[in-house]
Regions:
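Short N-terminal or domain-adjacent regulatory/targeting segments
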Residues: 1-18, 71-77
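Residues that mark the start of a beta-strand
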Residues: 20-24
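Residue-level signal for short, function-critical loop segments
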Residues: 27-31, 97
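Low-complexity, highly charged intrinsically disordered N-terminal segments
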Residues: 35, 39-42
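Short helix-loop-beta junction
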Residues: 42-53
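Glycine-rich beta-alpha loop elements in corrinoid/cobalamin-binding modules
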Residues: 60-210
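Conserved small/polar residues in nucleotide/adenosyl-binding loops
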Residues: 226-233
Length: 237
Protein backbone atom coordinates (compact mmCIF):
# COMPACT_ATOMS: atom_id res chain seq x y z
CA UNK A 1 0.00 0.00 0.00
CA UNK A 2 2.65 2.56 1.05
CA UNK A 3 4.58 1.97 -2.16
CA UNK A 4 2.04 3.68 -4.38
CA UNK A 5 -0.43 5.68 -2.26
CA UNK A 6 1.64 6.88 0.70
CA UNK A 7 -0.07 7.64 3.99
CA UNK A 8 2.82 6.38 6.13
CA UNK A 9 3.43 7.59 9.65
CA UNK A 10 5.83 10.54 9.50
CA UNK A 11 4.92 11.70 6.00
CA UNK A 12 4.36 15.46 5.73
CA UNK A 13 1.04 16.78 4.46
CA UNK A 14 0.56 20.51 3.90
CA UNK A 15 -2.11 22.85 2.55
CA UNK A 16 -1.15 23.72 -1.04
CA UNK A 17 -2.75 27.14 -0.68
CA UNK A 18 -0.02 28.07 1.82
CA UNK A 19 2.92 26.78 -0.25
CA UNK A 20 5.29 29.01 -2.23
CA UNK A 21 7.64 26.35 -3.64
CA UNK A 22 7.05 22.63 -4.21
CA UNK A 23 9.92 20.14 -4.45
CA UNK A 24 9.47 16.59 -5.73
CA UNK A 25 12.29 14.47 -4.27
CA UNK A 26 12.69 11.62 -6.76
CA UNK A 27 14.53 8.40 -6.01
CA UNK A 28 15.09 6.65 -9.36
CA UNK A 29 14.39 3.19 -8.00
CA UNK A 30 11.53 1.42 -6.26
CA UNK A 31 10.00 2.56 -2.97
CA UNK A 32 11.56 -0.30 -1.01
CA UNK A 33 15.08 0.71 -2.03
CA UNK A 34 14.56 4.47 -1.86
CA UNK A 35 13.05 4.53 1.62
CA UNK A 36 16.17 2.86 3.01
CA UNK A 37 18.23 5.88 1.93
CA UNK A 38 19.05 8.12 4.91
CA UNK A 39 19.91 11.14 2.75
CA UNK A 40 16.36 11.38 1.44
CA UNK A 41 14.98 11.50 4.98
CA UNK A 42 17.42 14.26 6.01
CA UNK A 43 16.69 16.54 3.03
CA UNK A 44 12.95 15.80 3.22
CA UNK A 45 12.93 16.90 6.86
CA UNK A 46 15.01 20.05 6.29
CA UNK A 47 12.89 21.37 3.43
CA UNK A 48 9.61 20.63 5.19
CA UNK A 49 10.68 22.62 8.26
CA UNK A 50 10.01 25.71 6.15
CA UNK A 51 6.30 26.45 6.44
CA UNK A 52 5.87 27.62 2.83
CA UNK A 53 8.00 24.91 1.20
CA UNK A 54 6.75 21.38 0.62
CA UNK A 55 9.00 18.44 -0.23
CA UNK A 56 7.23 15.29 -1.41
CA UNK A 57 8.55 11.87 -2.42
CA UNK A 58 8.47 10.14 -5.79
CA UNK A 59 9.76 6.67 -6.63
CA UNK A 60 10.09 4.60 -9.79
CA UNK A 61 7.11 2.25 -10.12
CA UNK A 62 7.53 -1.48 -10.51
CA UNK A 63 7.22 -2.92 -14.01
CA UNK A 64 3.69 -4.19 -13.37
CA UNK A 65 2.40 -0.88 -11.99
CA UNK A 66 4.13 1.16 -14.70
CA UNK A 67 2.29 -0.92 -17.29
CA UNK A 68 -1.03 -0.09 -15.63
CA UNK A 69 -0.11 3.61 -15.40
CA UNK A 70 0.69 3.81 -19.10
CA UNK A 71 -2.39 1.84 -20.12
CA UNK A 72 -4.62 4.15 -18.07
CA UNK A 73 -2.64 7.33 -18.85
CA UNK A 74 -1.82 7.98 -15.20
CA UNK A 75 1.19 10.33 -14.94
CA UNK A 76 3.89 9.76 -12.35
CA UNK A 77 2.86 11.39 -9.07
CA UNK A 78 4.09 12.24 -5.57
CA UNK A 79 3.05 10.11 -2.61
CA UNK A 80 1.99 12.92 -0.27
CA UNK A 81 -0.44 14.88 -2.47
CA UNK A 82 -0.84 12.37 -5.32
CA UNK A 83 -0.28 15.33 -7.66
CA UNK A 84 1.51 14.67 -10.97
CA UNK A 85 5.18 15.59 -11.26
CA UNK A 86 4.37 18.24 -13.85
CA UNK A 87 2.79 20.41 -11.11
CA UNK A 88 6.03 20.79 -9.14
CA UNK A 89 8.48 23.69 -9.19
CA UNK A 90 11.51 21.44 -8.64
CA UNK A 91 11.93 17.83 -9.68
CA UNK A 92 15.08 16.60 -7.95
CA UNK A 93 16.78 13.25 -8.49
CA UNK A 94 19.32 11.72 -6.13
CA UNK A 95 21.90 9.80 -8.14
CA UNK A 96 23.30 7.04 -5.94
CA UNK A 97 24.47 4.62 -8.65
CA UNK A 98 24.90 4.72 -12.42
CA UNK A 99 22.46 1.90 -13.13
CA UNK A 100 19.61 4.25 -12.16
CA UNK A 101 20.31 6.71 -15.00
CA UNK A 102 17.79 5.13 -17.35
CA UNK A 103 15.19 5.23 -14.58
CA UNK A 104 15.55 9.03 -14.47
CA UNK A 105 14.64 9.26 -18.15
CA UNK A 106 11.80 6.78 -17.76
CA UNK A 107 10.37 8.71 -14.80
CA UNK A 108 10.43 11.97 -16.76
CA UNK A 109 8.71 10.27 -19.68
CA UNK A 110 6.13 8.71 -17.38
CA UNK A 111 5.45 12.19 -15.98
CA UNK A 112 4.89 13.61 -19.47
CA UNK A 113 7.90 15.92 -19.16
CA UNK A 114 10.24 16.24 -22.19
CA UNK A 115 13.37 14.19 -21.53
CA UNK A 116 15.84 16.60 -23.13
CA UNK A 117 16.28 19.91 -21.34
CA UNK A 118 16.44 21.77 -24.68
CA UNK A 119 12.92 20.58 -25.50
CA UNK A 120 11.38 22.14 -22.38
CA UNK A 121 9.94 25.65 -22.49
CA UNK A 122 11.23 28.70 -20.62
CA UNK A 123 8.44 28.83 -18.05
CA UNK A 124 9.78 28.98 -14.51
CA UNK A 125 8.56 25.55 -13.45
CA UNK A 126 9.69 21.91 -13.57
CA UNK A 127 13.35 22.68 -12.81
CA UNK A 128 15.08 19.31 -13.19
CA UNK A 129 17.80 18.90 -10.56
CA UNK A 130 20.27 16.09 -9.86
CA UNK A 131 22.59 15.53 -6.92
CA UNK A 132 24.29 12.72 -5.07
CA UNK A 133 27.61 10.89 -5.43
CA UNK A 134 27.25 10.08 -9.15
CA UNK A 135 27.11 13.72 -10.21
CA UNK A 136 30.83 14.06 -9.54
CA UNK A 137 30.77 13.31 -13.28
CA UNK A 138 27.60 15.04 -14.50
CA UNK A 139 28.23 14.82 -18.25
CA UNK A 140 26.40 11.53 -18.97
CA UNK A 141 23.18 13.23 -17.82
CA UNK A 142 24.00 16.78 -18.95
CA UNK A 143 21.49 16.78 -21.83
CA UNK A 144 18.61 15.92 -19.52
CA UNK A 145 19.24 17.86 -16.29
CA UNK A 146 18.77 21.63 -15.86
CA UNK A 147 21.22 21.94 -12.98
CA UNK A 148 23.43 19.71 -10.86
CA UNK A 149 24.22 20.07 -7.17
CA UNK A 150 27.85 19.14 -6.54
CA UNK A 151 28.51 18.11 -2.95
CA UNK A 152 26.16 18.16 0.02
CA UNK A 153 22.63 19.42 -0.49
CA UNK A 154 21.47 20.43 2.98
CA UNK A 155 22.15 24.15 2.45
CA UNK A 156 22.08 24.53 -1.30
CA UNK A 157 18.59 23.05 -1.76
CA UNK A 158 17.15 25.81 0.40
CA UNK A 159 19.25 28.46 -1.32
CA UNK A 160 17.87 27.35 -4.69
CA UNK A 161 14.31 27.38 -3.39
CA UNK A 162 14.77 30.84 -1.87
CA UNK A 163 16.08 32.14 -5.20
CA UNK A 164 13.23 30.48 -7.07
CA UNK A 165 10.64 32.00 -4.73
CA UNK A 166 12.04 35.50 -5.29
CA UNK A 167 12.31 35.17 -9.06
CA UNK A 168 8.93 33.50 -9.48
CA UNK A 169 7.26 36.47 -7.80
CA UNK A 170 8.88 38.78 -10.38
CA UNK A 171 7.91 36.70 -13.45
CA UNK A 172 11.41 35.67 -14.50
CA UNK A 173 11.89 32.78 -16.93
CA UNK A 174 13.77 29.52 -16.51
CA UNK A 175 16.87 30.75 -18.36
CA UNK A 176 17.06 33.77 -16.06
CA UNK A 177 16.76 31.51 -13.04
CA UNK A 178 19.45 29.09 -14.22
CA UNK A 179 21.83 31.96 -14.88
CA UNK A 180 21.34 33.26 -11.34
CA UNK A 181 21.48 29.75 -9.87
CA UNK A 182 24.89 29.23 -11.48
CA UNK A 183 26.23 31.92 -9.14
CA UNK A 184 25.50 29.72 -6.12
CA UNK A 185 28.47 27.68 -4.90
CA UNK A 186 28.15 24.03 -5.91
CA UNK A 187 25.74 24.56 -8.81
CA UNK A 188 26.62 23.36 -12.31
CA UNK A 189 24.27 24.40 -15.13
CA UNK A 190 25.21 22.35 -18.24
CA UNK A 191 23.59 24.78 -20.68
CA UNK A 192 26.07 27.47 -19.59
CA UNK A 193 29.17 25.43 -20.48
CA UNK A 194 30.53 24.01 -23.72
CA UNK A 195 32.14 20.59 -23.33
CA UNK A 196 34.62 19.21 -25.86
CA UNK A 197 35.56 15.54 -26.00
CA UNK A 198 38.58 13.53 -27.07
CA UNK A 199 38.22 10.76 -29.64
CA UNK A 200 38.04 8.18 -26.85
CA UNK A 201 35.05 9.92 -25.24
CA UNK A 202 36.93 11.52 -22.35
CA UNK A 203 36.46 15.22 -21.61
CA UNK A 204 39.01 17.38 -23.41
CA UNK A 205 37.94 20.85 -22.34
CA UNK A 206 35.07 22.66 -20.62
CA UNK A 207 34.52 26.27 -21.70
CA UNK A 208 32.19 28.48 -19.61
CA UNK A 209 29.73 30.65 -21.53
CA UNK A 210 28.25 34.06 -20.66
CA UNK A 211 30.99 34.81 -18.12
CA UNK A 212 29.92 32.10 -15.67
CA UNK A 213 32.49 30.81 -13.20
CA UNK A 214 35.12 28.52 -14.76
CA UNK A 215 35.57 26.36 -11.64
CA UNK A 216 32.77 24.96 -9.49
CA UNK A 217 33.59 23.83 -5.97
CA UNK A 218 31.47 21.16 -4.36
CA UNK A 219 29.47 22.14 -1.30
CA UNK A 220 30.59 20.85 2.08
CA UNK A 221 28.55 21.42 5.24
CA UNK A 222 30.59 23.19 7.90
CA UNK A 223 27.79 24.40 10.19
CA UNK A 224 25.66 22.73 12.82
CA UNK A 225 22.27 21.15 12.20
CA UNK A 226 20.75 23.84 14.44
CA UNK A 227 21.90 26.48 11.96
CA UNK A 228 20.38 24.54 9.06
CA UNK A 229 17.02 24.43 10.81
CA UNK A 230 16.92 28.20 10.89
CA UNK A 231 18.44 28.63 7.44
CA UNK A 232 16.92 31.23 5.13
CA UNK A 233 18.87 33.22 2.59
CA UNK A 234 18.45 36.91 1.82
CA UNK A 235 18.37 37.69 -1.89
CA UNK A 236 18.35 40.94 -3.81
CA UNK A 237 17.13 40.91 -7.42
Amino acid sequence: RDRYIGGESGSVIKNKDNISVRFAFCFPDTYDIGMSHLGMKILYSLINQRADYWCERVFAPGIDFEKLMRENRIPLYALESLDPLSEFDFIGFTMQYELSYTNVLNMLDLAGIPILSKDRDDKLTNIIVAGGPCVCNPEPLADFIDLFILGEGEEVNLELMDLYKKMKSKDFGKKDFLRRAAEIDGIYVPSLYKVYYNDDGTVKEIIPQDNVRPIIKKRIITVSYTHLRAHETTLHL
